[in-house]
C-alpha cells in the first residue's frame, strides 16, 4: 500500500518480507520493516490499512493477509503463523487485535 510505503522504507519492507519466506515471526518482521521504531500516530495509520474492513480491529482473515498489505506479491500466513500472531497480540482475549494492542506489539520488539 502506498500509505505504508510513505511511512516505512520500501527497502526495509522488502528485507522484512524476505525474512518471512521460511516462517513468519511478528517480532522479526516488526523490527526488520522498521515498524518497531514508528510513532503511535504512524502505527495507527498502518493499523488502518491492515484493518481492511475498517471494523476497528484486525481479525483472523486480515491477519492471514498481513504481509499482502506490505506487498501484493507476498504470501498469506498459514494457520499456525496466524494463530501465533493473534495469541501474541490479543491481550484481552477477544480473538482480534485492536489499535492499542497493535501499538503494544510493535513496541515490544
From Swiss-Prot:
Ca(2+) 2 binds at residues 90, 92, 94, 96, 101. Belongs to the parvalbumin family. Transmembrane segments: none annotated. It comes from Raja clavata. Gene3D superfamilies: EF-hand (1.10.238.10). This is Parvalbumin alpha. The modification N-acetylserine is found at residue 1. Keywords: Acetylation, Allergen, Calcium, Metal-binding, Muscle protein, Repeat.
Amino acid at each position: 500500500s502506498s500509505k505504508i510505503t510513505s511511512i516505512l522504507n520500501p527497502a526495509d519492507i522488502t528485507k522484512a518480507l524476505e525474512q518471512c519466506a521460511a516462517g513468519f515471526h511478528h517480532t522479526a518482521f516488526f523490527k526488520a520493516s522498521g515498524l518497531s521504531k514508528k510513532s503511535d500516530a504512524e502505527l495507527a495509520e498502518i493499523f488502518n490499512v491492515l484493518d481492511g474492513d475498517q471494523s476497528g480491529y484486525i481479525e483472523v482473515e486480515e491477519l492471514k493477509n498481513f504481509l499482502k498489505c506490505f506487498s501484493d506479491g507476498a504470501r498469506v500466513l498459514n494457520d499456525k503463523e496466524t494463530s501465533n500472531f493473534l495469541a501474541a497480540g490479543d491481550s484481552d482475549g477477544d480473538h482480534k487485535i485492536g489499535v492499542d494492542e497493535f501499538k503494544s506489539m510493535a513496541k515490544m520488539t
